[in-house]
Structures are given as C-alpha cells and as structure tokens.
UniProtKB/Swiss-Prot annotation:
The gene is ARHGAP11B. InterPro entries: ARHGAP11A/B (IPR042869), Rho_GTPase_activation_prot (IPR008936), RhoGAP_dom (IPR000198). This is Inactive Rho GTPase-activating protein 11B. It comes from Homo sapiens (Human). GO terms for cellular component: cytosol; mitochondrial matrix. Interacts with ADP:ATP translocase components SLC25A4/ANT1 and SLC25A5/ANT2.
Length: 267
C-alpha cells in the first residue's frame, strides 16, 4: 500500500526535475470535503453546487457520479447523432425553465430537446463553485503545453494524479461520453477537436482578463494572465489530451512508484 502523501511528493519532485513544472498550493481531498457540510444548506439545488453536496449515482467502472450528469449524458446518448450537438445553442427561455425544473428535482431531461440538455450540461460545469480542472493546476497545465508532444502528454497525465479521486471519476465518465460523441462525428459533425474547443472554457472556467498567474510567474515574464482569448490553443490542446487519454487519468507509472519505494527505503 503506497503512502499517498509520499506519492504526491514524488510526483511534485518528478514534475519539477523532469519537466520544469512547479506546482504549489494543490489542495487535497480532505480540504475539498469541507463542501459536504454545505449539503444541508443547499437543499435540492443542482447548479452552483460542489460535487460532494450533489446527489450521486453509482456507475459501474466509474464510481459515484453526480446524478444530473448521468441523467444528462444518458439522455444525450439517445440523440448522439444530432448535428451540431453542443455547438448549436438551445432556446434561452427553455434553458432557463429547464434549469429551474432540474433545481427543483423534476425529472424532465428525457423529454427536453437535445440542444437544451447540451446547453444545460455546459452550464453545469461553468457554474461549479470551483472549476473541475482546479485553478491551482492551471499554471502547471499551461506550462506543460510548452513541452514536446510526448513529454507534454506525460506531464498532463502526471498532473491529473494530483486531482481528488471524485474529480477523476467524473472526468473519466464525462470524457468517455465525449469520446462516444466524437465517434459519431460523421453524423453530428462534432469530432474531438470541436468538443475540446467547446468544453475547454467550461471545464476551466476561464475568461478574458480572469485569473492572474502567481507573482513568481509574472516576474519571470512567462505569462501575465490565463485569459481564454490569449491562450485558447493551449487550453484546447490540453483538454484534447485528456479526452484522448481519459483511461490513463490518475494512473501513476509503476516505474515511478518503484523509484518512490526505493527513495523511501534509503531514508
């Protein structure tokens, strides 16, 4: 049984030594459990609510996933052939009414237009109190984009090992769903690149002029902001990597674990 704190420390050291990526202030699972105490205050709301305070459904192979996400993806699977799914906007009025019904516990997704469900799904991620790809990893993820293709992919997947387990479960489930959408791109015109363009700003919750980099990074002149407009290609490419390698999320290379054990034994 590996000591999770030791694994995390080794990952941070490995990222810094081999890729020049420094990660600071990453919050662990225990810190995120504070959201559970808010469950009683939230009531039945779905939007703007932390994952841990939402109703969950057990999904084989993925674990416990927010029930709304499961219901939305299941409903959209029936319309996966729809051209422009996620790209075409639904009715603003219908979307607002649909969101209100969902927040009041009404099971209405099965009868809603697919474009409305798709719009609601994007809004769900966009309104999370914290982005599913946490802000304290944004700088490191952006730094990884400067690496060569193979090294970049390895670095991004190693960074995924710093995510909380429940976050990884949701990402694996959702990225597998998006993969299924992309497999029908001959009909829906939504390949993995198009999906990455659409979901990157929702998963990262980035916006123009939003979120300053650390003062350390500013001094080095690496980047001044994490604005969506300026770094759109980087964010889209990063989401594309996660989409293509969703099965490998939070799976630490065994060779790295052996190095961890050797380091522990030599202490």
């Amino acid at each position: 049984m590996w000591d999770q704190r030791l694994v995390k420390l080794a990952l941070l050291q490995h990222l810094r030594a081999f890729y020049g990526i420094k990660v600071k202030g990453v919050r662990g699972q225990c810190d995120r459990r504070r959201h559970e105490t808010a469950a009683t205050e939230i009531g039945g709301k779905i939007f703007g609510v932390p994952f841990n305070a939402l109703p969950h459904s057990a999904v084989p192979e993925y674990g416990h996933i927010p029930s709304f996400l499961v219901d939305a993806c299941t409903s959209l699977e029936e319309h996966i052939h729809t051209e422009g799914l996620f790209r075409k906007s639904g009715s603003v009025i219908r979307l607002k009414a649909l969101k209100n019904k969902v927040d009041h516990g009404e099971g209405c997704l099965s009868s809603a237009p697919p474009c409305d469900i798709a719009g609601l799904l994007k809004q769900f991620f966009r309104e999370l109190p914290e982005p599913i790809l946490p802000a304290d990893l944004h700088e490191a993820l952006l730094k990884a984009q400067q690496l060569g293709t193979e090294e970049k992919n390895k670095a991004i997947l190693l960074l995924s090992c710093l995510l909380a387990d429940h976050t990884v479960h949701v990402l694996r489930y959702f990225f597998n769903f998006l993969r299924n959408v992309s497999l029908r791109s001959s009909e829906n015109k939504m390949d993995s690149s198009n999906l990455a363009v659409i979901f990157a700003p929702n998963l990262l919750q980035t916006s123009e002029g939003h979120e300053k980099m650390s003062s350390n990074a500013e001094k080095k002149g690496v980047y001044q902001t994490l604005s969506w407009k300026r770094y759109q290609p980087c964010w889209v490419l990063m989401v594309s990597v996660l989409l293509h390698h969703w099965k490998a999320l939070k799976k630490v290379n065994m060779k790295l674990l052996v190095n961890i054990r050797e380091r522990e034994d030599n202490v």
